[in-house]
Amino acid sequence: MKMKKIILLFLSAILVFSFCGCDIISDLMDMGIQEPDGPANIPDVPEVLEPVDPNWPVTAFGAEIPAKPEKVAVASPALAEYISDMGYFEKVCAVPEFCGFDEAAVKPKIGSVRLPDLEAIKSAEPEYILTFAKFEESVLIELQQMNITVICMDAPMSLDELRTLYKEIALFFSGAVDGITEGENYVAEYDSALSALAYSGEKKTAGFIRALDYMMITGGTFENEILSAAGIINVAENYSGYVFPEENWKEFDPDVIFLNPDIHLIDLETSDLYKKKTAVKNDRVYNVDIDAIGIGSKRSLDIIKDVLATVYGDYSGGTAYSPAYPSMYQK
């Protein structure tokens, strides 16, 4: 009898728990607490995304640049000078031989496009090589095996093409957003500098001799466009192709003559073509880096300032050159 009472009490307890237990569990779930044997109620954690740089990737020089370049070699002297002028030279790890600007002196040299120093290129470890001229196919294959991307572009042949190149350089080094701003700002700065050096007084004529025959700066050239913008009248501006027509040689009689540095004045004064020209007789012949004028860089503009000061005595923006050396006509 006593055992039956115990069993009845036990069954009653089970029934009570069955009815009440569901309500208790339901209340716990309403409070956000799950049954111990149920799945854990872990709140969703939002995924942390890396910030997106709007500058990259960017298309520059017709190639996609996926990320900011850190090590760049340059295989063309003028291109290296443009990059230096724009303030990106810290990213340049190597330059070609025969760069004419001071900043290039401290950079490792990698030869030239025609005679590249592949060991020097390998040591420099560039991500990119920028160039105006194409490497030979065999060299290009070796560079590709070094995981170097070679980007070849056209050299500028006019002021407009130079402006476009400056903008592409900015895109390459600074990206799609910053590069646009930096490129436009630099072009505006360059145009302002070009306008500021121009001479507006009474003009004189000048000849720019490359070699002692008929080779000189003529019209239809990048050099002539820059000289004209600066207020210099090129005596050969009506001709083209860097050659003054032999049949019209009598027309060549400028007030001032500028010679490439490798031409000696004595050779000019004893040349049948030049010895009777007014500038030669008046000792108005000067050596100047004519090739540098054709680059169109900041250094080019500085040279043109000195050319202007030499041609026009009242021009104060530059320093006049001394005659190449005392002329045989000098008294």
Please annotate each region the language model reported.
Residues 1-30, 143:
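Gram-positive cell-envelope targeting signals
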Residues 6, 21-78, 176-207, 309-331:
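Bacterial Sec-exported substrate-binding components of ABC uptake systems
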Residues 53-59, 108-119, 239-247:
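Short helix-initiation/N-cap motifs at beta->coil->alpha
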Residues 70-133:
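A short, structured surface patch at a secondary-structure boundary
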Residues 98-101, 183, 215-242:
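Alpha-helical, coiled-coil/dimerization segments enriched in small aliphatic residues
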Residues 115-134, 148, 243-262:
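Proline-aspartate-enriched helix->loop->beta-strand connector
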Residues 138, 153-170, 205-224:
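Extracytoplasmic ligand-binding site segments that recognize negatively charged/polar headgroups
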Residues 160-184, 195, 259-331:
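Structured C-terminal subdomain patch of bacterial secreted/periplasmic proteins
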